[in-house]
């Protein structure tokens, strides 16, 4: 295969043993699998070694977000093309074949948004599909800012896989428990407070922001079609907004 038609899979990990074996099995036919581990204390590194991955370590230090490690990892990759995969995401054979076909085209894009199927309480959540994420790109044209949930910046043409191509979507296995979601809500709202420390919200925001997030998820995005898990998910979306606003108020008194 032409050197320019090789793909490195980059996976950032921190105590990611739960799904890692399945995730790595799914990407075994790519040219390189690079694990960028953030000082895991479980069996993550052991699993990666068993799959013959190349492993680099990113010291967590003061970081409590993954984005700085993503920037480091993509530029540690050996190949021009990089596919970033989370440690709870499965790449389908159809997606792999699609990517290799794409990069052989003369006028292929420099970056690609890929749809993702999210699961909650064991159920595919239609309300969160297609959840496009920019995860495939030329590494030399890409910079990943050190901002939580930030989209990588690609200097070039970026395209998007159509939502109807569900066979090309990542399978997102997170399937978080309520306990994990509450834990992440605490983490994410803490980070959001840092980013919005100079922003102010009125009293009515305590009502309309949680309600609108619930309404948007349950009605506009269609969680109502996802049964009881859809209702619970919509409530949790509103809960996130309420916790953020409550913490914001707490800071001001």
Language model segments and positions:
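Acidic helix N-cap motif at the loop->helix transition within catalytic regions
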Residues: 18-21, 42-51, 94-95
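Short aromatic/hydrophobic "clamp" motif used to bind/position activated sugar donors
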Residues: 82
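Conserved donor nucleotide-binding strand/loop of the catalytic core
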Residues: 45-78
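Short beta-strand/loop segment that forms part of the nucleotide-sugar
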Residues: 30-40, 56-58, 87
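Catalytic-site signature of metal-activated, phosphate-bearing donor transferases
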Residues: 67-74, 85, 92-251
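Cell-envelope/extracellular polymer assembly enzymes that use nucleotide-activated donors
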Residues: 6-8, 32
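A conserved acidic beta->alpha catalytic loop
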Residues: 26, 37-46
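Short, well-formed alpha-helical segments that are part of the catalytic scaffolds
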Residues: 10-29
